[in-house]
Amino acid sequence: MSQIILDEQLGASELVVPLQKWFKVRRLKDILPHQTILDDRIPQILLSLSSPTFLTIDRDFWDRRLCNPGYGILYFAIPDFRQEELAISLKKLLRLRRFRSKVARAGKVIRVSATKIEFWEFQKNRLHRMPWKRPGRQPSE
């Protein structure tokens, strides 16, 4: 079962329960309780886990330098108040052959917006783009 790690700003009530139907879901603060986890520590934490996929809405993670074969990063370009849309969008995204397995996501930093998916891959210099329609209302971006 794929392991999804939720960034700290993601609400547990909006995501953990719906996502647990399909994935093993953990929050960063549950992995390292009683610690403040700054963004620059997150890649090392992810490398200590078994091929996790890190889910975030923090734009700082849309950075090709974070590509590593030990994990994948999914950055959804949505505002904080739209977190309730993430579970359905994530499920739809992970049905795509290109992102279906943890092996397929490993080494990628993926940005999902209302109209497209973009991603960088480990040791590749090309930004990949593909069309996408996020479920639900479409924000103006």
Q: Where in the sequence are the language-model features?
A:
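Acidic, PIN/NYN-like endoribonuclease modules and their adjacent C-terminal/linker elements
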Residues: 1-3, 7-8, 14-18, 22, ...
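Acidic, metal-binding active-site segment of PIN/NYN-like and related structure-specific nucleases
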Residues: 46-69
